[in-house]
Amino acid sequence: MTAKMLHLVRYKFPSLEPASLFLIPGSFLQERFRRDILHRAVIYEADNDRQGTASSKRRNEITCSGRKLYRQKGTGHARVGDASSPIRRGGAKSHGPKPRDFSTKLQTQVYNLAMRIALSTRFINNELTILENPINLSQPKTRILLEVLKQHKLGHEYGKALFVLNDNYFEDESLKNNNLLLASRQLGYHCSFIPVGEFQVRDALKFGKLFIDSEAMSLIVEKFAQRNTLSDMDQPASLTAYVDANSSSFTKSKPEPSLSL
Protein backbone atom coordinates (compact mmCIF):
# COMPACT_ATOMS: atom_id res chain seq x y z
CA MET A 1 0.00 0.00 0.00
CA THR A 2 1.38 3.41 -0.99
CA ALA A 3 1.16 6.20 1.57
CA LYS A 4 -0.39 9.46 0.46
CA MET A 5 1.98 12.40 0.29
CA LEU A 6 1.36 15.96 1.44
CA HIS A 7 2.88 18.74 -0.67
CA LEU A 8 4.08 21.69 1.41
CA VAL A 9 5.27 24.92 -0.12
CA ARG A 10 8.80 25.79 0.87
CA TYR A 11 9.66 29.49 1.23
CA LYS A 12 12.84 31.49 0.81
CA PHE A 13 14.20 33.51 3.70
CA PRO A 14 14.06 36.46 4.33
CA SER A 15 11.64 37.29 1.49
CA LEU A 16 9.29 34.37 2.33
CA GLU A 17 8.54 33.90 -1.35
CA PRO A 18 7.43 30.45 -2.56
CA ALA A 19 10.38 28.49 -3.88
CA SER A 20 9.60 24.78 -4.20
CA LEU A 21 7.54 21.89 -2.89
CA PHE A 22 8.38 19.68 0.06
CA LEU A 23 6.90 16.19 0.40
CA ILE A 24 6.00 14.52 3.70
CA PRO A 25 3.62 11.68 4.65
CA GLY A 26 0.04 12.87 4.33
CA SER A 27 -0.99 11.77 7.83
CA PHE A 28 1.92 13.46 9.63
CA LEU A 29 0.22 16.88 9.90
CA GLN A 30 -3.36 15.63 10.12
CA GLU A 31 -3.53 14.30 13.67
CA ARG A 32 -6.65 14.97 15.70
CA PHE A 33 -6.20 17.42 18.59
CA ARG A 34 -5.69 15.59 21.89
CA ARG A 35 -5.20 17.83 24.90
CA ASP A 36 -4.52 14.85 27.18
CA ILE A 37 -1.66 13.57 25.01
CA LEU A 38 -0.10 17.04 24.82
CA HIS A 39 -0.39 17.43 28.60
CA ARG A 40 1.40 14.13 29.21
CA ALA A 41 4.22 15.09 26.86
CA VAL A 42 4.69 18.57 28.37
CA ILE A 43 4.77 17.19 31.92
CA TYR A 44 7.24 14.53 30.80
CA GLU A 45 9.56 17.16 29.31
CA ALA A 46 9.28 19.44 32.34
CA ASP A 47 10.04 16.58 34.75
CA ASN A 48 13.11 15.53 32.79
CA ASP A 49 14.40 19.12 32.67
CA ARG A 50 14.38 19.49 36.46
CA GLN A 51 17.89 19.39 37.86
CA GLY A 52 16.92 18.04 41.27
CA THR A 53 20.08 19.46 42.88
CA ALA A 54 18.46 21.48 45.69
CA SER A 55 19.93 20.44 49.03
CA SER A 56 19.45 21.78 52.55
CA LYS A 57 21.13 20.74 55.78
CA ARG A 58 19.42 18.39 58.21
CA ARG A 59 20.04 18.39 61.97
CA ASN A 60 22.85 15.86 61.71
CA GLU A 61 24.65 18.09 59.17
CA ILE A 62 24.66 21.32 61.20
CA THR A 63 27.99 22.18 62.84
CA CYS A 64 27.09 23.06 66.41
CA SER A 65 27.27 21.73 69.92
CA GLY A 66 24.73 19.20 71.05
CA ARG A 67 24.46 20.91 74.41
CA LYS A 68 21.01 21.82 75.62
CA LEU A 69 20.73 25.61 75.45
CA TYR A 70 18.61 26.10 78.59
CA ARG A 71 17.58 23.95 81.44
CA GLN A 72 14.37 22.02 81.07
CA LYS A 73 12.37 23.80 83.76
CA GLY A 74 12.32 27.06 85.64
CA THR A 75 12.84 29.51 82.75
CA GLY A 76 9.18 30.32 82.22
CA HIS A 77 9.54 29.63 78.49
CA ALA A 78 9.07 26.65 76.24
CA ARG A 79 11.66 23.92 76.54
CA VAL A 80 14.47 24.04 73.99
CA GLY A 81 17.05 21.61 72.69
CA ASP A 82 20.36 22.29 70.99
CA ALA A 83 21.20 25.02 68.43
CA SER A 84 20.48 22.78 65.43
CA SER A 85 16.73 22.93 66.06
CA PRO A 86 14.79 23.98 62.91
CA ILE A 87 12.99 26.74 64.82
CA ARG A 88 16.23 28.56 65.70
CA ARG A 89 18.23 30.92 63.50
CA GLY A 90 21.13 29.09 61.92
CA GLY A 91 19.49 25.78 62.62
CA ALA A 92 18.62 22.95 60.29
CA LYS A 93 15.85 22.87 57.70
CA SER A 94 13.00 20.60 58.64
CA HIS A 95 11.89 18.33 55.80
CA GLY A 96 14.09 20.29 53.39
CA PRO A 97 14.94 19.24 49.83
CA LYS A 98 17.63 16.72 49.00
CA PRO A 99 19.08 15.81 45.57
CA ARG A 100 16.67 13.53 43.74
CA ASP A 101 15.70 12.44 40.27
CA PHE A 102 12.45 14.03 39.08
CA SER A 103 12.45 12.37 35.65
CA THR A 104 9.43 10.33 34.62
CA LYS A 105 8.77 7.87 31.83
CA LEU A 106 6.53 8.10 28.80
CA GLN A 107 6.01 5.62 25.99
CA THR A 108 7.85 6.56 22.82
CA GLN A 109 4.71 6.16 20.70
CA VAL A 110 2.78 8.53 22.97
CA TYR A 111 5.51 11.18 22.82
CA ASN A 112 5.80 10.86 19.04
CA LEU A 113 2.03 11.25 18.76
CA ALA A 114 2.20 14.39 20.92
CA MET A 115 4.78 15.92 18.57
CA ARG A 116 2.63 15.15 15.53
CA ILE A 117 -0.43 16.63 17.27
CA ALA A 118 1.47 19.81 18.16
CA LEU A 119 2.77 20.29 14.61
CA SER A 120 -0.64 19.44 13.14
CA THR A 121 -2.26 22.09 15.30
CA ARG A 122 0.21 24.74 14.15
CA PHE A 123 -0.21 23.63 10.53
CA ILE A 124 -4.01 23.82 10.66
CA ASN A 125 -3.81 27.32 12.20
CA ASN A 126 -1.40 28.51 9.46
CA GLU A 127 1.38 28.98 12.02
CA LEU A 128 3.92 26.55 10.53
CA THR A 129 6.24 27.52 7.67
CA ILE A 130 8.87 25.41 5.93
CA LEU A 131 11.99 27.33 4.88
CA GLU A 132 14.36 26.52 2.05
CA ASN A 133 18.06 26.11 2.78
CA PRO A 134 20.34 27.95 3.09
CA ILE A 135 18.89 30.43 5.59
CA ASN A 136 20.92 33.59 5.99
CA LEU A 137 20.99 37.39 5.79
CA SER A 138 23.03 39.67 3.58
CA GLN A 139 24.68 41.34 6.60
CA PRO A 140 24.96 40.46 10.31
CA LYS A 141 22.89 43.50 11.30
CA THR A 142 20.30 43.40 14.05
CA ARG A 143 18.47 46.27 12.37
CA ILE A 144 18.04 44.25 9.16
CA LEU A 145 16.61 41.24 10.97
CA LEU A 146 14.27 43.45 12.98
CA GLU A 147 12.96 45.02 9.76
CA VAL A 148 12.38 41.54 8.31
CA LEU A 149 10.41 40.50 11.38
CA LYS A 150 8.26 43.64 11.28
CA GLN A 151 7.70 43.28 7.54
CA HIS A 152 6.22 39.80 7.99
CA LYS A 153 4.39 40.69 11.22
CA LEU A 154 6.63 38.64 13.48
CA GLY A 155 8.10 39.36 16.88
CA HIS A 156 6.82 39.98 20.38
CA GLU A 157 3.87 42.12 19.29
CA TYR A 158 2.48 39.33 17.09
CA GLY A 159 3.87 36.38 19.03
CA LYS A 160 7.51 35.42 19.42
CA ALA A 161 8.82 33.47 16.42
CA LEU A 162 10.77 30.22 16.73
CA PHE A 163 13.22 29.08 14.06
CA VAL A 164 14.13 25.39 14.17
CA LEU A 165 17.29 24.85 12.13
CA ASN A 166 19.48 21.91 11.31
CA ASP A 167 22.23 21.20 13.84
CA ASN A 168 24.87 22.16 11.28
CA TYR A 169 23.95 25.84 11.67
CA PHE A 170 25.09 25.77 15.31
CA GLU A 171 28.53 24.29 14.79
CA ASP A 172 31.41 26.61 15.68
CA GLU A 173 32.42 27.54 12.14
CA SER A 174 28.86 27.87 10.85
CA LEU A 175 27.82 29.92 13.87
CA LYS A 176 30.57 32.45 13.22
CA ASN A 177 29.78 32.79 9.51
CA ASN A 178 25.97 32.83 9.61
CA ASN A 179 24.75 36.43 9.50
CA LEU A 180 21.25 35.47 10.63
CA LEU A 181 22.38 33.89 13.89
CA LEU A 182 24.81 36.74 14.54
CA ALA A 183 22.07 39.33 14.00
CA SER A 184 19.64 37.51 16.30
CA ARG A 185 21.80 37.65 19.43
CA GLN A 186 20.11 40.85 20.66
CA LEU A 187 16.58 39.96 19.52
CA GLY A 188 15.69 37.26 22.02
CA TYR A 189 12.58 39.29 22.85
CA HIS A 190 11.24 38.78 19.32
CA CYS A 191 12.63 35.47 18.03
CA SER A 192 14.55 32.38 19.06
CA PHE A 193 16.76 29.96 17.15
CA ILE A 194 17.27 26.37 18.32
CA PRO A 195 18.81 23.26 16.75
CA VAL A 196 16.43 20.52 15.73
CA GLY A 197 18.09 18.20 18.25
CA GLU A 198 16.69 20.34 21.10
CA PHE A 199 13.21 20.78 19.62
CA GLN A 200 10.47 19.68 22.03
CA VAL A 201 6.68 19.56 22.15
CA ARG A 202 6.65 22.64 24.41
CA ASP A 203 8.54 24.59 21.77
CA ALA A 204 5.98 23.65 19.14
CA LEU A 205 3.16 24.97 21.33
CA LYS A 206 4.29 28.11 23.14
CA PHE A 207 5.61 30.30 20.30
CA GLY A 208 3.49 32.50 18.06
CA LYS A 209 4.98 31.38 14.72
CA LEU A 210 7.01 28.30 13.91
CA PHE A 211 9.62 28.21 11.12
CA ILE A 212 11.44 24.96 10.31
CA ASP A 213 14.05 24.55 7.61
CA SER A 214 13.54 21.66 5.20
CA GLU A 215 16.48 19.59 6.46
CA ALA A 216 15.29 19.89 10.05
CA MET A 217 11.74 19.00 8.99
CA SER A 218 13.03 15.87 7.29
CA LEU A 219 14.70 14.81 10.53
CA ILE A 220 11.52 15.53 12.50
CA VAL A 221 9.42 13.45 10.12
CA GLU A 222 11.93 10.61 10.20
CA LYS A 223 11.99 10.61 14.01
CA PHE A 224 8.35 11.18 14.93
CA ALA A 225 6.33 9.72 12.04
CA GLN A 226 4.57 6.39 12.41
CA ARG A 227 6.82 3.52 11.39
CA ASN A 228 4.30 1.96 9.00
CA THR A 229 3.86 5.33 7.30
CA LEU A 230 7.56 5.61 6.52
CA SER A 231 7.83 2.01 5.33
CA ASP A 232 4.91 2.42 2.92
CA MET A 233 6.28 5.55 1.29
CA ASP A 234 7.55 5.35 -2.26
CA GLN A 235 10.13 8.02 -1.42
CA PRO A 236 12.06 8.77 1.78
CA ALA A 237 10.86 11.65 3.94
CA SER A 238 13.93 13.73 3.16
CA LEU A 239 13.36 13.62 -0.61
CA THR A 240 12.02 16.89 -1.99
CA ALA A 241 10.46 17.82 -5.31
CA TYR A 242 11.60 21.16 -6.71
CA VAL A 243 9.28 23.20 -8.87
CA ASP A 244 10.28 26.27 -10.82
CA ALA A 245 8.45 29.25 -9.34
CA ASN A 246 8.17 30.78 -12.83
CA SER A 247 6.67 27.71 -14.48
CA SER A 248 2.99 27.18 -15.11
CA SER A 249 2.85 24.37 -12.55
CA PHE A 250 3.63 26.75 -9.71
CA THR A 251 1.93 30.07 -9.05
CA LYS A 252 2.80 32.74 -6.54
CA SER A 253 -0.80 33.21 -5.54
CA LYS A 254 -1.87 32.27 -2.03
CA PRO A 255 -1.63 28.48 -1.72
CA GLU A 256 -4.62 26.40 -0.82
CA PRO A 257 -4.94 25.66 2.92
CA SER A 258 -4.92 21.92 2.29
CA LEU A 259 -1.53 22.09 0.59
CA SER A 260 0.53 24.56 2.54
CA LEU A 261 0.59 27.48 4.85
Swiss-Prot record:
Protein keywords: Mitochondrion, Ribonucleoprotein, Ribosomal protein, Transit peptide
Transit peptide, from-to: 1-35
Entry superkingdom: Eukaryota
Pfam families noted in UniProt: Ribosomal_L4 (PF00573)
Residues covered by region (Disordered): 72-101
Cellular compartment(s): Mitochondrion
GO biological process: mitochondrial translation
Cross-referenced Gene3D superfamilies: 3.40.1370.10
Keyword match NAD: no
GO annotation, cellular component aspect: mitochondrial large ribosomal subunit; mitochondrion
Role according to the record: Component of the mitochondrial ribosome (mitoribosome), a dedicated translation machinery responsible for the synthesis of mitochondrial genome-encoded proteins, including at least some of the essential transmembrane subunits of the mitochondrial respiratory chain. The mitoribosomes are attached to the mitochondrial inner membrane and translation products are cotranslationally integrated into the membrane.
PANTHER family hit by this protein: 50S RIBOSOMAL PROTEIN L4 (PTHR10746), LARGE RIBOSOMAL SUBUNIT PROTEIN UL4M (PTHR10746:SF6)
Subunit field text: Component of the mitochondrial large ribosomal subunit (mt-LSU). Mature yeast 74S mitochondrial ribosomes consist of a small (37S) and a large (54S) subunit. The 37S small subunit contains a 15S ribosomal RNA (15S mt-rRNA) and at least 32 different proteins. The 54S large subunit contains a 21S rRNA (21S mt-rRNA) and at least 45 different proteins.
Protein name: Large ribosomal subunit protein uL4m
